[in-house]
Design a protein with these regions (language model features):
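Short, basic/hydrophobic alpha-helical segments
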Residues: 8-16, 84-87, 103-117
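Active-site metal-binding loops of divalent metal-dependent hydrolases
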Residues: 1, 27, 96-98, 122-123, ...
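Surface polyanion/phosphate-binding segment centered on an Asp-His-Pro turn
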Residues: 205-225
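Structured beta-strand-rich core segments of catalytic domains in phosphoester-bond hydrolases
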Residues: 21-91, 95-99
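N-terminal, active-site-proximal structural segment of metallo-dependent hydrolase catalytic domains
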Residues: 1-35, 222-225
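Conserved beta strand-loop-helix elements of the APE1-like EEP
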Residues: 21-24, 54-71, 88, 92, ...
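Active-site environment of divalent metal-dependent phosphoester hydrolases
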Residues: 2-6, 29-33, 101-103, 125-131, ...
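Metal-dependent phosphoesterases centered on the DNase I-like endonuclease/exonuclease/phosphatase
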Residues: 21, 103-193
Length: 225
């Protein structure tokens, strides 16, 4: 989940992981088609259907390996471009890019009502600054709605890893700090419901070569009830 520049690096990175779903934030609408390794792309409602969209608008976009994934409309006039909700027969995912401290209460209600298996993206929230409004979203989803922070879960269960700038994969250690943003903060999160079983989670720092965020890669499955 990250903002990026189209120069071939992103396509090579996506080919390496072959993820079932990729959520990208701040994708300039005019450049989205240059992501060539995924053919099923889902943009926020209103934007996918408009041909003459302003080329400067940045979108949160879902790239899906197959066309079983469908878009679910989200209704928020000012911030439709920042959210994308997708689902198939087994999963539901909510990708977001929260504005910093702006209209958080109304946005929180939309996120809560989504009731998705996974909520992920750039929350613009960091534990060191838990007094800002954006942290309220994470706090509510974890403490009131029963979601778990998969990175913290991975650290506790020894399932968290990071890939350094040389491409070496190493186990992440609980108590250490791992940034997800060039500004030396951890502002990107993957939150999941209790029935999501984490296999592993990775912060890949190599993406800082072509974006200002580290990618977060999650391997998980849904427990059978």
């Amino acid at each position: 989940m990250f903002r990026y520049l189209i120069d071939g690096s992103l396509n090579e990175f996506l080919k390496e992981y072959q993820a079932d779903v990729v959520i990208l934030q701040e994708v300039r609408s005019s450049l989205a088609d240059e992501v060539t390794c995924y053919t099923h792309k889902i943009s926020p409602n209103l934007y996918q259907e408009i041909e003459n969209i302003k080329k400067t608008i940045y979108l949160t976009v879902a790239l899906c390996k197959d066309d079983t994934w469908q878009k679910v409309n989200i209704d928020h006039f000012h911030y439709n471009n920042r959210f994308v909700k997708i689902k198939n027969d087994d999963w539901s995912i909510f990708g977001l890019h929260l504005p910093l401290q702006d209209d958080i209460d109304s946005l929180l209600s939309i996120i809560q009502e989504s009731d998705c298996d996974i909520i992920c993206g750039d929350f613009n929230a960091h534990r060191k600054y838990s007094q800002i409004k954006n942290w309220k979203v994470i706090d509510n989803l974890i403490n009131d709605k029963g979601y778990s922070d998969l990175w913290e879960k991975g650290l506790k269960e020894e399932k968290a890893y990071y890939i350094d700038y040389k491409g070496e994969k190493k186990k992440a250690q609980q108590g250490n700090f791992y940034r997800t943003f060039v500004g030396n903060t951890h502002i990107d999160y993957v939150l999941a419901k209790a029935d999501i079983h984490l296999i592993d989670i990775v912060i890949d720092m190599r993406t800082l070569a072509f974006t200002d965020h580290c990618a977060m890669i999650v391997n998980c499955k849904k427990d059978k009830s």
